[in-house]
Amino acid sequence: MKLTKAVFRFRRTNLSTLLVITYLVITTLYVWDHFRYHFTLPSDYNYAQMLADAWLDLEIITQYPHPYASHANDKVHDYLLDRVKEITRDSMFAEISDDYGMGLRTLFRQEDAISGTKESTVVYYESSNVLARVQGRNSALDGLLLSAHYDSVPSGYGATDDGMGVVSMLAILTHYVKNQPERTLVFNFNNNQEFGLAGASAFFEHPWSKEISYVINLEGTGAGGKAVLFRTSDVSTAQVYAEAVRQQPFGNSMYQQGFYNGHIGTETDFQVYEDQGLRGWDIAFYRPRNLYHTAKDTVLYTSKQALWHMLHTALQLTDYMAINKPDMEDTSNAVYFDLFGKWFVVWSARSLFYWNCIILALFPSILAILFLVAYDMQLLKFNFWDAMLRLPVSVCLAYFCVKLFQVLVGQLNPYVFSRDYVSPILAEASMFIFMNYVILSSWERLRPLRDFKTVALVEVSMVLWIYLISVTRWLRDSDYTATGLYPFTIGYTFVSIGAIIGVFCATFKAKLNPEDDSYVGDSKVDIEQQQMLMQHQYQQHSQKHSNQHSPHHSTHHSAQHSVHHSPRQSIHQVPSSEQRQRDASETPHVIISVDHTAGHQEDSEVTPLLNTGTVAPFPKPVPERVSRKSFLRNVVTSILNYDWSIQFMVVTPWVTYFTWICLDLIMGAMNQTIQESAKGTTFVTHMALIGSLLLSLPMLPFTYKLHSFAGMLFLLLAVTTAVWTIVAPPFTESSPLKLRFLQTIDLDKNNSSSVYLYGRERTFMEPILDDIPSVTKYRCVEYAGDGVDICEYNGMPPRMFNNHHEAESDWTKIMTLEILKDDRNSTSRTPYQPITAELKINVEENRVCTLNFNSTAFKNWKQGVSPLREVVILHENPSSNVTPSFYNTAMKNGYYQDEFGNDHYRWNNGITELQLHKLDFKRGYYKIGLEWIPQLLYRGYDPATSSSEEDDALGVSVTCYWGEYDTDSITDGFATTNVPAYDELRKYSPKNIIYSSKEKGMVSVTKYVEL
């Protein structure tokens, strides 16, 4: 019992040891959760074969980059179609559908997310989705869609984005053609997701889409690792995930909030499905981002373990939905997260709001009641300013030091976060803790408070209370889409409980403890009863001792002699009134928790763990009733003496764990956005600073009691990680700097062949270009005004077509523009009548072109409103016979067909861009019709606007893209790729540089025309 008391006494050694154990446990759980999937390959033969087949499929479809604008895209389509036919061949309840063969096409509008205006991009898309349907036994159940896209970006091989999703679907399809589900399953292997989410949009033109209510979308925005639940539709779907995915669930609603708030700049097909009313789950790989969309997105840089994590997660979820009819009534936004990769927690965002309101009222009320009780008992006798100011002063000074370090890193090595975000966070957190340790422990030595930790916990709780109010309001104002704010609720809850425990124990311990007159309110009767109990205990001890060793009078005399000479050695010694008054005058008073000897001699590292003193005698016998009452009081007081350990275990482990896990998830997904924009840099550095402070927060109330050895450990950690943060190279071969590439042939500038490199700073690109053999001159300027620079130089011309390599003038044979019709200057058109024109784009071996529009009062999305109101995709009919009409077919969301089968899209808020995607490489043209309003009609909106015939002109910039670069070509007798400028960059760039495509293709050809 004595050993137990000594071990749990509030001592520097005990606290520091418990802290080290806590950090070790958290680290172990984190590492185990992060890397456990490496050791969970399937042992079951069927699952192992499923994984082996999926891996083989992945190796085949990722042999070449296969964007929509490439011939390799057709090869992947054909392979998937053959595999689906092979899988479903012998099934009586499975069927397939090929959009390519059906000739399915669509014309739809996308909002202009960049400008935030009502102006929009219109997309014409010829689909080559491959679909399979497994008919369920129960037709009353709504269908489930599984979706993944098989196209890649031009610079990537598409292993993670999104080959793993595709082969996971093939494996699941193989399973269900042998095991008929209750619910109908539809598999959509869709195309052209990378540049417009077109394949998902085209799905809703297919008749099978009418059967679907739920969707599982598989995506990849990283390069392996674990597949996370990016987002889910509502509480019901989140609960389905929790019940279905029992092995290694992984998800967090912070990512969901990132999509809702626009912090995640890219979108997945899930957005299209959700906009069409489907409910479901968006599952994706999310890190590392710097290998995403690059030549390292191959099977060499991922693993079977990562593939199995996605496949198994999707399989568990599909299995659950295929045979169950879950309750899907709750459609409110969900808050969710996993615990240790073992359990999955789901709340309603609205319930979180109500819970926040409750605890914001409850916890302060409990603390107020306890303080009122203490005040009524006259226990609040302490120097208020001395007690309340020391933590704020310490935090401010420590924050100043950490902020200086952050500024220093920003000047010397700002991009280190892209490679390693853990070291800067640990440096800032350990520096913050060490500075608070020095300040608070020194202050405690100069002006000791008996229980500063409780005072500090109350203060931290007050600060979190204020912040939680703003968080709760944010949650309400966001219409409950701010689903990533739950960590603040958890942090405030645990810290407030710790503060309540401290104040509660201190209040009632002061009432029960009669040993210290500094606790006003204890009666003399209680003191006498305590003395009588101690006398009774002593007499029993003395009687036993005298029977075994010596005559009673000798033992009694010896005991008296011992007490007379060594009164401070008694474990139950009651100090004299004079001594108590002296202690009370020297120590500031607060309702604090102390051990049973506190107030007279504070424990230190030289205090014995086990007190070996004797027990003092008392002359009077004690009644049995008083003895039992005092004994119980003694037990309760002893329990209350260890409140510090309860406070520590409630606050520090849980708040630290949740803070670190959430911080790691955010930084792991966003740290490499520091390469993409100044906004990304600001977000990452500020998040690291805020995260390090929050990580230190649960330790602050206990820092003053740390052992000096623990303080030195924090100092050592701070110095080591700080030095590494400053001197570490920000980019390495395994964590490279990503630059974006585009080569453009401008037919309006003498067929100039310009290479454009986009990167975070020109200081990274200029040394690279200095070492490229063919580059003699380049120019670098700021691009887009967000910290991104662009470098331009004349590069080796691309070799896309074997019959057009001889001279630069031959590029005019690859793309030309014909104006088939233009009535802007026609006398038959009235000044108020819309202007119409028809344009033919002749382009060789092409699938993708984009048209951007401008006028004297409008330039893309930068200013004004686009005058273009309608676009027409003209098919095989003669252009002179086409008469646009609103009444030939019903208009649906701006789209309709005329009697000639031409596709129309009308949007009266202005069309900014038209994207054209066709499948047939051999059909060497696009024919489009345009309708825009004259500037004269704008006078009603702006009287100062003048109009002329030139003002009504519509500028059209046509850009066509080619997506393949890895195809062999012969140039001057040497083997090369189709884009030798890109090949040269890859060959002569440092190992810590990697390239990604900027646009829909590696090469673009542009031409401007005015209508």
UniProtKB/Swiss-Prot annotation:
Binds 2 Zn(2+) ions per subunit. Keywords: Glycoprotein, Hydrolase, Membrane, Metal-binding, Metalloprotease, Protease, Transmembrane, Transmembrane helix, Vacuole, Zinc. Its cofactor is Zn(2+). It is found in: Vacuole membrane. Residues 1-14, 374-390, 442-451, 509-647, 703-708 are cytoplasmic. InterPro entries: Fxna-like_M28_dom, M28_fam, Peptidase_M28, PFF1_C, PFF1_TM. Zn(2+) 1 binds at residues 149, 161, 219. One of its GO terms (cellular component) is fungal-type vacuole membrane. Residues 36-352, 412-420, 473-487, 669-681, 730-1011 are vacuolar. Residues 534-585 are annotated as: Disordered. Glycans are attached at residues 671, 751, 825, 854. Residues 542-567 have a biased composition (Basic residues). Its EC number is 3.4.-.-. Pfam families: Peptidase_M28, PFF1_C, PFF1_TM. It is a multi-pass membrane protein. Zn(2+) 2 binds at residues 161, 194, 293. The chain crosses the membrane at residues 15-35, 353-373, 391-411, 421-441, 452-472, 488-508, 648-668, 682-702, 709-729. One of its GO terms (biological process) is proteolysis. The record marks 292 as: Transition state stabilizer. May be involved in vacuolar sorting and osmoregulation. Belongs to the peptidase M28 family. This is Vacuolar membrane protease. It comes from Eremothecium gossypii (strain ATCC 10895 / CBS 109.51 / FGSC 9923 / NRRL Y-1056).
